[in-house]
Structures are given as C-alpha cells and as structure tokens.
Amino acid sequence: MINKLSLLLFSMLCYTLFFRRFSIAVSILFLSCCCTRIYSQQLINSSSSDQVRLETTESKIESILSLMTLKEKISMCHAQSQFSSPGIPRLGIPELWMSDGPHGIRAEINWSNWDYSGWTNDYITAFPALTCLSATFNPDLSNQYGTSIGEEARYRKKDVLLGPGINIYRTPLNGRNFEYMGEDPYLASIMVVPYIKGVQMNGVAACVKHFALNNQELWRGHINVEVSDRALYEIYLPAFYAAVKQGEAWSIMGSYNQFRGQHCSHHKLLLNKILKTDWSFDGVVISDWGGTHSTKEAALNGLDIEMGSPINNDTSPRQAYDANFLGTSFLELVKSGEIDERILNDKVRRILRLIMRTTLDSSRPLGKINNIEHSQVARKVATEGIVLLKNEDDFFPLNPAKKLTIAVIGENAIKSMTTGGGSSELKANYEISPLEGLKKRFKNASIIFSKGYSSEATNQSYKSLIKDALITASLADLVLFIGGLNKNRGQDCEAADREELKLPYNQDYLISELQKVNPNIGVLLVSGNAVSMPWVSDVKTVMQTWYLGSEAGNAIADVISGDTNPSGKLPFSFPVRLTDNSAHFFGELSYPGNGETQYYKDDILVGYRWHETKNIKPLFSFGHGLSYSSFKITDIKSDKKIYAANDSINISYKLKNIGSKDGAEVVQVYVGKTNSQVRRALKELKGFKKTYLGSGKQTTESITINITDLSFYDESISNWNIETGGYTIYVGSASDNISKVLGINLK
C-alpha cells in the first residue's frame, strides 16, 4: 500500500512539473485525489466553508498528518533557528515563531546566534515584572496585562510567548525571582489564569514556565531536586495545574534542572503522567533552550519541540538543527522501529493543534504595539503593585505644590531596568527613570541628584561617591534614596543567584550615613527580591517599587505624590536574616545543594508558612502593604459553622475606608487545620478580594472557599484527602495582621 501511494505521489509530482501552465486544472485533479498541498490548505482553512464547518480541528489534524512524510514529522519536533521551528511548505503548514518574555517582547535575535539583529522596528512597551503584577492582588489587571502583551506579541508576528513564569519563590537569592509570581501557590494560581487568557485571546500561545522545580539559577542546568510528593503537589505544582486546567494554556516549557534523577524537559512523571495524563494537557511541551539531553528520553518522556542552539554548526543554518536530539537520531530510531511512530505522531498532533490555534487561526487580530492603552496598562500595574512597607509620620505622600528641596540619591534613580537580566531583557520604546518621573511631577520642588554608589566601573572612588551624596543630602529638606538591586549578573539576573541577602555596592552603609546627615529620609527599593534592612528603624519610610518597565518613573511619582494611593501587597516574605528563610534554615544541602543534588528539607513550609508555623517574625510579612488611608474590616462571619464535603464556605464582612483618601484594600482569608493528623502549616491563603472605596465609604463583601481547597496531598494514597474536624479561618489584611479568627467544622 505504501509503495502504491509513493508511486502515485511521484506520478503526480511529474504531472505537475510537465504541466505547470495548467496548474489550476491540475490542482482540482489533485484535490480529488486528496494528496496535495491544496487539499491540506483547504483542510486548514475549512472554517470558511459551510459544508465543512462541522469538521473538527482534530479531524483536520488527522487528515494533515496522513499526508506527512516521516522526515517532515521529525522536522517539526526541533528548532530551525534560535526562536523558530519549521513548517511544511508543501502542505501549507507555517513555521512557529517564539519570543521571550513574560513582561515584554524581546528584540529580534539572529537566525543562528544570540546576537541582536539590529532591527529598528522591534521596540516595545516594557511592562512591570511579574513580581509587581502579583503584588497588585488584582486578577482583572492581570488579564489586562496579558491582553496587552499578547497584542504586542501578535503585532510582532510571534506565535508563542515564552511566559508567564510561575516558579515558586523559595529563596530570596534566586536570580530569576523577579520573573515569577511569589511564594504562595494560591496567589500565583489566581493571578496566572487571567494573564494566560489575555495573551491567548490574541491567537498567541502562552508558554508557561518552567515546569517544574526550577527554584534557583545556580547550577540550574544539572542540579537534581529531591522533594516529597506532598510538597510537589501542594506547593510547586498548583499554579501549573491552574494554568492548564483553568487557563487552558497551549504550551508549557520544561525546566533545566533534574527531579529525582531525570531532566525535567523530558521527565516521565512530570510530563507523561502528571501533565499529559492526569491533567489531560493537549498542548505542546517545549524544552528550555538547550535543556534536552537524550534522544530516547526526549522521545519517550513527553517533550514535543526541542529548542536551543544547533549542536552541529558545520552545515547550513537550516540543516544545523538536524543534528539535535529530536532530529536525525530521532528519525533513525523511528525508522528502525526502536521507537514507535505513534509516539512521534502524538507530538506532531500537538504541534499541529498549536499551529491551528495560533498562526492558522484566520480570525486572530492583527495586534497592536506601543499604543497609549498599553502605556496606561503598564502604568496602572506599576502603581497598583508598588508596596508601601513603612510610612512613619506620614512621610508620604509629598505635596507637589510645596516648594521643597529634594535630594534624590542612588544609582537606581537613573539606571535602566529594562535592559539586562537575561532572556527577559527588553528593547523598550521608552523608559521613564524615577528621577525623570519625579522632576516631571514635582515641578515646584528643587530636585538635586547624587549617584551615591555605582554598579559599574567609574573614575570616582566609592568614598568620593559617598562624600558627594552626603553633601547633597545635607542641602535638602528631605532625602529620597533610590537603590536596591539591578539586572546585573549576580543580582536579579538569569543564570546566576545572589550571594547574600544584603544590598550590594555598600548601600547599607550609605543609607546609614545619609540618615545621620538628614534624618528626613525615605528609601525606595528597586528589586525583584527581598533584601535585609539593618537601617530600617532609622528611616522614615520604605517603599518596594520592583522593576516597573516603561512607566517606572511616572508610576513612582504617582504614588509618592498621592495621585495614586498605594494598594500593593507583598507576594513574598522579607526575612530579617537569610537563615530565617525556610530554604536556608537547613544548610547548604537544602540550598544551594552540593553541586549535584539538593533536598527541599523545608517541605511544605515555604515562605510565610514557615514563618507562621515556626513563629519566626519576618521583617515584612507576606500580604503586607500600607495605604495612605485606613481600612476597618468588621462583621466577619461564615455562612455556617458545620460543613459537608461538597459545600462551599462563604465568608462575609464589612469593609470601611475610615481614612481621608480614596483607596483600596485587599482582604485576605487564610485557613488552618486544628489538631491535624499530618504536618500542616499554621495557615494558608485560600481567598482574597481587592476592593476600592472612597473616603468614608463602606461595603459588604464576601469570599468563597471550596471545601476541596482544604485538602492535603496524602502520600499514603497518592491522592488528595480532606480531614474532617475543626478548621480555623483567619481574616485580615496580611498574613500577620488578622482582624478576626473563626472556627468551623467539617463533618
């Protein structure tokens, strides 16, 4: 049968070559034979025909698959350039084009190396980093963010956006934490779903990363993570589960690290069982770049597209990738029968499904880029994500009408934060620095600047920089120190971790000296990570401002001036010292490991779960964030006292803005199990709601919790289990600021 089909195809090819001028007639003939590109193209575009509208995407995929040669199938399973995988031109199947990253579309990269292409039309809007988005505690804003970045990806003709990142914040030293959504799996789950839906409504696939347990950059390419099943399912997988089941993500990126001795980009348990079987994921698994290590492992254990640089650079650029693991060696294993072609077909089906959802979706919009709406979304996310940690004597807001001399000290007041950081580096259409934003908003003030420290080589000594800063501070009515971390390697940057919790470049000393010269000082921290603050009791205010993207300076000025009332909440805890963090409490085998393996000895007690359960007071707690107003939560109650397994818990409350300014508060609901038979955290976030209220206004709100959300992963049955008996419900405005405690029972 195969020989007859091959003969038929060869005859048809000859027919085409000899009768080109009769191509239309030939195409009709070929269509009737169901063997040509025109037939496959009609299958692809059949949604435009009433007669074939009922034909499902899956039947189209099967029809196209039947027309593909073995070599064509293989070609779709690996890259053809740094950021694309090949199509099948003869069948009208287009290429797939991918792009970093989660908070902006990366500038164009050369076909076969990592140099930038030097285009003049690849400038984009830089959105705030995902730590900032998570700090908004605002799912609606997450959807606006995803929609906007999806529009920019679509305009740049990208089919797959390599983001969002949702790895759990386990250690404050992780160089890539700024790309993720914090330490709590529930918060990350709630925030990631609308982001994905926003991206994909543009016909662009979200590629959720990095699956899984990629919680540090140090030794990320090989470190083997050992963690309990319970911690895996309760802490490190829930956000990915939400991305797949509620967000309906079209692609997932495997991580570099190993888990239980197997690389995660081709992992039997993670990809074949959990993702594709248990969760019924029908999308594409894409390797992290260079994260593939074995043809057999990749073929058999769930990887669909291998991405990364070519292994063989001695051939033409388009052929260089054939030498990669899912290239020629995969082809030979299928030809020999060592690997069943059905395994290959499953990969190709998934890739075709992705293509149908993206580049072959004729209804997808054209996209937009660098428009005012995107700038507005970026600014809104930035202002809502800024977290006011401390505000002694109402230091903020500052009155823009007042004639003040303001000393702005610190390199981060002028340093670009859209460049650097690794693969998330951006080529922003514009970037307003904090100093620019302040000068624009505070036109009546005299703003004087001194760098104070430098992260780069300079002809000034650090002592000279400090001396100049102290002189500047002494001349001012107040000091705004704008420092923190940056995107340099060893700070908030891919491929390396920080070495310590303290601020770099002698900033702790500088802040202490500035306070002595001018005690009227506020500190603005730019970072995606927690830092230690030995000077915290000596300064008036501390504000966490993250990496805010194009609108950074405007957003900071909005909040400092009081144009926007801060409402951000911390998505991770700030420990007093490094050993207060759960990953570091257990020594180097827990973090960073011994160079080969690390053991997650903190198990399920990550972040605030550790602080609360072990009664270790953090510097600033998860969920903490101040406002220029004050809010009161009253009349807190549950709808029942006793619940059945299929019930939902409804927590109602009254929220009143008792301050003089309009603002927003995030009411947070935590739940803990009383007298549990297994180890459990004192409390876990199970619900939250952000509410905007005018000064003096009051509203009645409610938060619903599904009983199933009270379950734990029971390793004895390898499944979720719910304990009956008493539970404690904590309602407040932060994990350590609880307004009322309720007791309920589950029968």
Descriptions of predicted regions:
Residues M1-S47:
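Bacterial Sec-dependent N-terminal signal peptides
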Residues Q41-F712, N719-D736:
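Glycoside hydrolase catalytic-domain context in secreted enzymes
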